[in-house]
């Protein structure tokens, strides 16, 4: 892609050539959040946490398993793999950095919706730079 040329969102997504979709990121991030909280990693818990049907959660878990992010058997517990943990920890970190940023900018305590809408479109370098900016501004 030409660096200064405009493309559609789909064009940027295709050029990124990533295996994990934005929806998969949401599921993996939630699995890692549930694991941090000590909650069981089961289809019904995941579905409830994301406000989706268990069948939708089960299908997405199959996709994540196919990419090596998780292991699970139908009707069994979900286990996040090392690969999944690495990516999931980054997703949680990215979420936290953006949440701090939006709360500071908007002077609020909760910017969940804002973060959820934008987090998938921020690359690692931008998240890192934003984190450094927040640190320089004394925003923790």
Predicted regions and their residues:
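N-terminal helix-turn-helix DNA-binding core of bacterial DNA-binding proteins
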Residues: 14-52
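C-terminal regulatory/oligomerization modules of transcriptional regulators
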Residues: 1-3, 113-140
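Alpha-helical linker/hinge and terminal dimerization helices associated
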Residues: 94-105, 137
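Basic, amphipathic "hinge/linker" alpha-helix immediately C-terminal to the N-terminal HTH DNA-binding motif
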Residues: 76-94
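Canonical helix-turn-helix DNA-binding module
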Residues: 41-78, 82
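N-terminal leader segment of winged-helix/HTH proteins
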Residues: 1-21
């Amino acid at each position: 892609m030409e660096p200064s040329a405009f493309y559609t969102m789909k064009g940027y997504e295709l050029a990124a050539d990533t295996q994990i979709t934005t929806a998969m990121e949401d599921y993996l991030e939630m699995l890692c959040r549930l694991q941090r909280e000590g909650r069981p990693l089961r289809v019904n818990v995941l579905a409830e946490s994301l406000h989706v049907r268990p069948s939708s959660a089960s299908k997405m878990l199959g996709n994540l398993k196919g990419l090596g992010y998780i292991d699970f058997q139908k009707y069994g517990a979900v286990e996040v793999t090392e690969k999944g943990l690495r990516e999931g920890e980054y997703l949680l970190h990215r979420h936290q950095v953006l949440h701090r940023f939006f709360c500071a900018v908007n002077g609020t305590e909760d910017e969940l919706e804002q973060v959820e809408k934008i987090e998938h479109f921020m690359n690692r370098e931008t998240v890192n730079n934003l984190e450094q900016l927040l640190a320089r501004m004394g925003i923790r």
